[in-house]
Amino acid sequence: MIEADRLITASPREREEQQDRAIRPLKLADYIGQPGVREQMELFIQAARGRAESLDHTLIFGPPGLGKTTLANIIAQEMGVSIKSTSGPVLERPGDLAALLTNLEAGDVLFVDEIHRLSPIVEEVLYPAMEDFQLDIMIGEGPAARSIKLDLPPFTLVGATTRAGMLTNPLRDRFGIVQRLEFYGIDDLATIVTRSAGILGLPIEDQGAYEIARRARGTPRIANRLLRRVRDFAEVRGRGHITREIADQALNLLDVDERGFDHSDRRLLLAMIEKFDGGPVGVDSLAAAISEERHTIEDVLEPYLIQQGYMMRTPRGRVVTRHAYLHFGLNTPKRLGEQPSGDLFAVSDE
């Protein structure tokens, strides 16, 4: 199974970037959720504008699909400057980075997605550019080679990564602002869905937006993708209007259940319950049981299930929690009766 094939993947799909651009907020005032990040960035941007300076270099990290690219574009919009976008894997040689840096105007934003994937040789060129706004370039080859320094206009580097731990310390230390994006709550996601539906000219009821939001795995990108698929269903079977019932029918047809699990998630949990008595079970045995690759379980399926408290990693292997049994309407073994929950998105009935 390929992660990109799943409807509920947080990774971007082909052509999705262009679709998302149409509904992406351009101002902090329209940026929904992440209240701490929003308030801090508003303060930093106002201060930089008041001093007529470029914003400090900014690192944005967190799981995929939470709005790192959106926030980078908002920073440029709020600062009233242009943004140039690239990604770590694209910058293969120092010359690739130099070409971008020398074309920046004063105050511009250079956005580097997947910045943890920069090669060491490109990083070395980036350090003086970030710190001193200077570019060291080697002219010539062999004994005749010499280094010259080019002055760069002040600019803001905005780096985005899903793996902050993979950044080298020298690179991380050069960011004056570091922001972590967290998974969204259901209410904020419902607001995002309602806003996106309005931009798309799609009538939607509050309960319809909520139904989509609670199955979106805390991720705006997934929420907007589900909205587009529910729109297709509503236009054919619901007269173009999204109600809770229409959203529920559409998402059930798409095999996304009320917890945001798809067939692969449920198959993994059921295999652990039915074939291994809830665990512990080794990942290789589990992979053989469901005919998947080991890395698919570790990198694609496990993270969300662990984060939501439906399974755990232990020294003896993987085990399911009582929430997995309850999800399938099964009796919970007594040994699991007091297990703690890791559910991030649970909604209290009180």
Curated annotation (Swiss-Prot):
Pfam family, one: RuvB_C
Catalytic activity entry: ATP + H2O = ADP + phosphate + H(+)
Annotated stretches, region: Head domain (RuvB-H): 258-350
Main location: cytoplasm
Region called Large ATPase domain (RuvB-L), residue ranges: 4-184
Keyword ATP-binding included in the entry's annotation: yes
Family: Belongs to the RuvB family.
Protein name per the record: Holliday junction branch migration complex subunit RuvB
Organism, scientific name: Ectopseudomonas mendocina (strain ymp)
